[in-house]
Structures are given as structure tokens and as C-alpha cells.
Regions:
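A conserved short coil-to-beta-strand element within the FAD-binding core of flavoproteins
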Residues: 2-23, 78
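A short, compositionally biased
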Residues: 12-19, 132-133, 304-306
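Short, solvent-exposed loop/turn segments that connect beta-strands within catalytic domains
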Residues: 12-13, 25-28, 145-148
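C-terminal structured subdomain/cap of oxidoreductase catalytic cores
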Residues: 21-90, 94-95, 206-262, 286-377
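Short amphipathic beta-strand/extended segments with alternating polar/hydrophobic composition
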Residues: 31-36, 148-155, 233-234, 275
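Mid-to-C-terminal "cap/lid" subdomains and adjacent gly/pro-rich loops that border
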Residues: 58-201, 289, 296-297, 362-377
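Short, glycine/acidic-rich hinge or "gate" loops at secondary-structure transitions
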Residues: 264-276, 362-367
């Protein structure tokens, strides 16, 4: 295993002896022999690329660029998902602490002294670990939209969402997407999942909304047999209208939040997009202009039945290939209504048990309660 090295994976080579070779480059072409298994953990953007270069991919894609088909697996590189965000910016009264204050060395040193000595100051309790937000929440659809609008949004999920997929998509991937949308609609109807994450940033100067369960689906595809060429990444953001509609309603919710008495007491005045931006079309246009990736890419080597566009089975094994597993965010068939980092940790933990043949039943875990720590030690 080579970690954090400047190595570019080229392809997996398959021999009749069933040994598998992992070719890499680090200035020169090198070959590593795997006597048991290969564990592919290149992430949701590069795991599908390596599989495609190895001939494990939708056959039409490989044929078009002259790569021999090892396994026709339509789901490789499909089902790309990402968390998108919109935001509202506001100005506050002078003197209210801002994140930029922590860049001031004198201020920062004084606040650190207060934090360590008295557990007081701007670093306590939340700003000590503040990198993005002072507070966040995960909000179900019915909690930030009116009931009739939420019902309409859920109906739009259930009403032929497949029309918004790209034209050349395989029928197996379409079938898997239909299962996904049915599950998303059910979770929203029950209120058992969040539709939006809200981040309260910089004392309220920025309120950020992140779409938890987008319906748009993108692709990752190699464009040639050149292993050093980057893959073509098409996230197809906003290709399903539901995604934009939820973010529009999220921004309207921000305005309600900024209008509450506690935040108005801070002198909050919306500055972006500005109160003149009122229609759904104008708000959506603004959101499309500011949105960007959250780098929460998942789904391109999904753990699903092969008939539903799956790439790996429940034991992380790639369909149709001996001794090859994928262990990274690409196996998630759906984005969680949360950040993906902890889920990736869980995937790795579970993968270790699967590969070693361990059962998680009866295992004992060390539970640490941070409240019991001696912070003065």
C-alpha cells in the first residue's frame, strides 16, 4: 500500500493466472503484483476512471475510445452525486466579532489566553474549533417549506424523474435511479431525512444552505486510452428541477431566519442576493451563479444489484472480476443527509471486517466520553 504518494494509477492488468497487476507511474512505469486482492480506493472521481481504463465499464464508452472490454458494467462512472449550496449574505452592526478577527495575531493571542485560563472569550465554546460555521442544523423538507409546497416537491420526485437523466444512460442504471427516487420521496414524506443543511457562518453574516438529496445525476468518463488524461467530469448540476426548487425555498427560509428578533438585534441586513431578488427565477439564477461543489462526490461505483446499475456487491467485490474490491465514497448509492467523511470512515471499518472475514457481532468498542476529559491536563 502506498499512501499520500505522487503516483498516478494507470490500469489494472488481468492475466489468465488470475494474478492481478497494478500499474502505476512515479516518473517511470512500475508494476506491482497482487498475490491476493486489489483494493481500489481512488475516490468517486478516480476509481471509475481506473476501472474504465482497465476495461471495466459500459461497453459503448470503451468501444468509442478503443479500450478492450473486460467486463461490460454499465454503472461504472454513472450516478455521480454531490452536495450543492446556496447562501445569503448579511451585514451586522459594527463590533460584532467576525471570523476575520482570528487572523489578527494580537486578538487571537488574547482570546487564546482567555480560553485556556477561564474558558471564556471568543474562542469558547464554539469558535475555538470554528473553520466554517458557529452552528449548523439538518432540516427536513416540511420544516422549512409550507406543507402544500413540500407535497408538490415530493410529487415531482415521484413523477418520472428519469426524464432528466442523460440520453445514453443504460436501462439498468435507470432502474437503479427509480429505486433511489422512490426511497428519497418516502424519506421526505416521513420526515426521516434532512432535505437541507443550514450553516450559520461568521456570526450570521452568511447563512449557507446545502442540498442533501439532489436528484440530478452526473457522470465520470475517460475520454481516451491515455491513462494520464483527466477524466471528463459532468456533474449535471440542476439537471433535475427539484434541486433548484429546494435551494430556492432554502434561501427564502434564510430570510425568515434573518428577520427573527435575536438576529435583527444584531442589525442584520441582507446584502446578497438582496431583497430586490424576489421571484423564484431570479433567486434560482443567483443560486446558480454562486453555487459550487462541496467535494462530497459519491455514487460512481455504487453498491447495488448489478441489474440496478451496481458496480460492487455487498462484499465490495466488483461484479465479474475476481479479487478486486472498491472501498471509498464511490460505493455509496445515495448521498447521506450528512457530510460524507464519517461515512467513508465507516465504509473503511466495515471493509476491514469483510476482507478479514470478521463478524461485527460480539465485537467490543472503546467508547470515549469527551465530557470526562481533564481539559486542564
Amino acid at each position: 500500500m502506498v499512501c499520500c504518494a505522487a503516483i498516478n494509477a494507470v490500469r489494472l492488468l488481468f492475466k489468465t493466472s488470475r494474478k492481478q497487476f497494478f500499474s502505476t507511474t512515479a516518473g517511470s512505469l512500475q508494476t506491482a503484483v497482487a498475490t491476493q486482492e486489489i483494493i481500489l480506493s481512488a475516490g468517486a472521481l478516480h476509481s471509475p476512471k481506473i476501472l474504465q481504463l482497465s476495461g471495466i465499464a459500459p461497453a459503448p464508452l470503451l468501444t468509442n475510445i478503443g479500450i478492450n472490454v473486460t467486463v461490460n458494467l454499465p454503472g461504472v462512472g454513472e450516478n455521480l452525486q454531490d452536495h450543492l449550496f446556496g447562501l445569503t449574505l448579511a451585514s451586522l452592526n459594527p463590533g460584532i466579532p467576525a471570523n476575520s478577527d482570528l487572523v489578527n495575531a494580537t486578538f487571537d493571542a488574547a482570546q487564546r489566553d482567555l480560553h485556556y485560563a477561564k474558558r471564556k472569550g471568543e474562542l469558547f465554546p464554539s469558535r475555538w474549533t470554528d473553520t466554517i460555521a458557529e452552528a449548523l442544523s439538518f432540516i427536513p423538507l416540511y420544516n422549512f417549506t409550507k406543507a402544500d409546497l413540500a407535497n408538490n416537491l415530493i410529487s415531482s420526485i415521484e413523477a418520472n424523474s428519469t426524464q432528466y437523466l442523460h440520453d445514453s444512460i443504460d436501462s439498468a442504471v435507470v432502474a437503479g435511479y427509480e429505486k433511489q427516487t422512490a426511497l428519497i420521496a418516502s424519506m421526505h414524506s416521513k420526515g426521516s431525512t434532512a432535505a437541507m443543511e443550514l450553516l450559520y457562518v461568521d456570526g450570521g453574516r452568511s447563512v449557507v444552505n446545502i442540498l442533501m438529496h439532489p436528484l440530478s445525476r452526473g457522470t465520470v468518463s475517460v475520454t481516451s486510452s491515455d491513462p494520464f488524461a483527466p477524466p471528463a467530469i459532468d456533474p449535471r448540476y440542476f439537471s433535475h428541477p427539484y434541486d433548484g426548487q429546494v435551494l430556492v425555498e432554502s434561501l427564502r427560509f434564510n430570510r425568515k431566519l434573518l428577520a427573527t428578533a435575536p438576529i435583527q438585534a444584531l442589525g442584520a441586513i441582507e446584502t446578497l442576493p438582496g431583497t430586490a431578488t424576489e421571484s423564484d427565477a431570479d433567486i434560482l439564477s443567483f443560486i446558480k451563479g454562486v453555487t459550487s461543489t462541496e467535494y462530497h462526490y459519491v455514487g460512481t461505483c455504487a453498491m447495488l444489484p448489478k441489474a440496478l446499475g451496481g458496480v460492487v456487491d455487498a462484499k465490495l467485490k466488483v461484479y465479474g472480476v475476481d479479487g478486486l474490491r472498491v472501498v471509498d465514497a464511490s460505493i455509496m448509492p445515495l448521498l447521506p443527509s450528512a457530510h460524507t467523511q464519517a461515512t467513508v470512515y465507516a465504509i473503511a471499518e466495515k471493509a476491514a471486517d469483510i476482507i478479514l472475514g470478521h463478524s461485527v457481532e460480539g465485537r467490543q468498542y472503546l467508547v470515549i466520553n469527551p465530557r470526562s476529559w481533564d481539559h486542564n491536563a
